[in-house]
Amino acid sequence: MKGKAGGKAADAAEKVAASNRRARFDYDVEDTWEAGLVLTGSEVKSLREGNVNLSDAYAMPRGEELWLLNCRIGEYQQAAHFGHAPLRDRKLLMNRAEIDRVRGKVEQRGYTLVPLRIYFKQGWAKVELGLARGRSHEDRRGAIAERESKREMDRALARGRRR
């Protein structure tokens, strides 16, 4: 049994299983939501090992539910007979009002739901979804140039402080 002081810090910690770094480069993320994941036992064990790929994954509403598609969770080696399909569609758990709000925004032209990271929060697998609009090639170049100029300014300021 956990004590009150020790349990809160451990519960508040989030263990990130995977992050989609490419999503922030390819998309302009405007809003984020947290959703639970419906997983099998072998999928949870694979996630805890970090055996997941979010690079081509996206979420979309189907009927009254939200689904995560193209998220590859690798097979768990010790689950020989009771494994899972690595690319199966996975149901996302959100409140009805949140699902309706997300559906309204996704149905607008040009928006998509992109998983930004999968993590464990108090032992439960969660996914952070971002409402995103795709960037054009020119926008990506502009973002790179802006990031480089910010780095140069920070370096110049750091050099100025040292003197």
UniProtKB/Swiss-Prot annotation:
What the entry lists under InterPro entries is as follows:
SmpB, SsrA-bd_prot, SsrA-bd_prot_CS
Source superkingdom: Bacteria
Residue segments, region Disordered: 138-163
Enumerate the Gene Ontology biological process terms: trans-translation
Q: Name one GO molecular function term.
A: RNA binding
Q: Is the keyword Cytoplasm assigned to this protein?
A: yes
Question: Which key words tag this protein in UniProt?
Answer: Cytoplasm, RNA-binding
Q: Which cysteines are joined by disulfide bonds?
A: none
Its localization reads: Cytoplasm
Write out the GO cellular component annotations.
Answer: cytosol
Pfam families listed in its UniProt record: SmpB (PF01668)
- HAMAP family recorded: SmpB
Q: Which family does it belong to?
A: Belongs to the SmpB family.
What's its job?
Answer: Required for rescue of stalled ribosomes mediated by trans-translation. Binds to transfer-messenger RNA (tmRNA), required for stable association of tmRNA with ribosomes. tmRNA and SmpB together mimic tRNA shape, replacing the anticodon stem-loop with SmpB. tmRNA is encoded by the ssrA gene; the 2 termini fold to resemble tRNA(Ala) and it encodes a 'tag peptide', a short internal open reading frame. During trans-translation Ala-aminoacylated tmRNA acts like a tRNA, entering the A-site of stalled ribosomes, displacing the stalled mRNA.
Q: Indicate what this protein is called per its UniProt record.
A: SsrA-binding protein
Q: Top-down, what is the taxonomic lineage of the species of origin?
A: Bacteria, Pseudomonadati, Myxococcota, Myxococcia, Myxococcales
